[in-house]
């Protein structure tokens, strides 16, 4: 199973995170399938690759709680629901 979760980068006391699609059995800093975003909690900057995230969500990837909250603020789930209603 694939999850969308945070991967810690940066230096000591100055963490930044990459949002990655990664296998559930991998470690936090393990090999990821694809980098789909970036999150800096100190400056509150976020970059999300929306097409890649939507593609993984459509294939069944599960976001962690933190990635879900970040994505919700960016409006990804409203876009995903709009795409579903267009298909029906």
Curated annotation (Swiss-Prot):
<keyword id="KW-0687">Ribonucleoprotein</keyword>
<dbReference type="GO" id="GO:0005739">
    <property type="term" value="C:mitochondrion"/>
</dbReference>
<dbReference type="GO" id="GO:0009507">
    <property type="term" value="C:chloroplast"/>
</dbReference>
<comment type="similarity">
    <text>Belongs to the bacterial ribosomal protein bS16 family.</text>
</comment>
<dbReference type="GO" id="GO:0003735">
    <property type="term" value="F:structural constituent of ribosome"/>
</dbReference>
<dbReference type="InterPro" id="IPR023803">
    <property type="entry name" value="Ribosomal_bS16_dom_sf"/>
</dbReference>
<dbReference type="InterPro" id="IPR020592">
    <property type="entry name" value="Ribosomal_bS16_CS"/>
</dbReference>
<dbReference type="Pfam" id="PF00886">
    <property type="entry name" value="Ribosomal_S16"/>
</dbReference>
<dbReference type="GO" id="GO:0015935">
    <property type="term" value="C:small ribosomal subunit"/>
</dbReference>
<keyword id="KW-0689">Ribosomal protein</keyword>
<protein>
    <recommendedName>
        <fullName>Small ribosomal subunit protein bS16c</fullName>
    </recommendedName>
</protein>
<dbReference type="InterPro" id="IPR000307">
    <property type="entry name" value="Ribosomal_bS16"/>
</dbReference>
<keyword id="KW-0150">Chloroplast</keyword>
<keyword id="KW-0934">Plastid</keyword>
<dbReference type="GO" id="GO:0032543">
    <property type="term" value="P:mitochondrial translation"/>
</dbReference>
């Amino acid at each position: 199973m694939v999850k969308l979760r945070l991967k810690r980068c940066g230096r000591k006391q100055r963490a930044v995170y990459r949002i990655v699609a990664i296998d559930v059995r991998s470690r936090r800093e393990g090999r990821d399938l694809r980098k789909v975003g970036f999150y800096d909690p100190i400056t509150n900057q976020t970059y999300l690759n929306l097409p890649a995230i939507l593609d993984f969500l459509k294939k069944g990837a599960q976001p962690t709680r933190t990635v879900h909250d970040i994505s919700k603020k960016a409006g990804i789930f409203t876009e995903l629901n709009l795409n579903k209603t267009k298909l029906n």
